[in-house]
Amino acid sequence: MINRAAVILKYKAPFIQWVNDADPYKDNPGITLESENKDCTVYLILEEDAEKLEEWISLNFEQLFESEIEDWYTDESLWPKNRNRKLFDEWIDVECHSVLIDTVDGKIIDDEI
């Protein structure tokens, strides 16, 4: 096991609606909730933070929200204007998993993106 917890953000319908509505080219294939929640970004956090997840989210939701939005559109003019905790909660479900087992016999490499 590793000394981290995993936070997984899953989109709710309003997030997907924004992705489709904000598309500046209007040529996307119609992104769906099901297709986009199959492979989600995983954020590793301290085990201690997982025990106080609501507090951790309150401190970090802005960065998480912007990271998820920027994955779709880098043009900030397309981003929702009032990115507050209420909107975050309406658009995104948060899962936290505290048992992570590394099954690979090799060094973890951070590509520093």
Task: Outline where the language-model segments fall.
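Amphipathic alpha-helical interaction modules
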Residues: 18-60
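Extracellular structured ligand-interaction cores
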Residues: 4, 40, 85
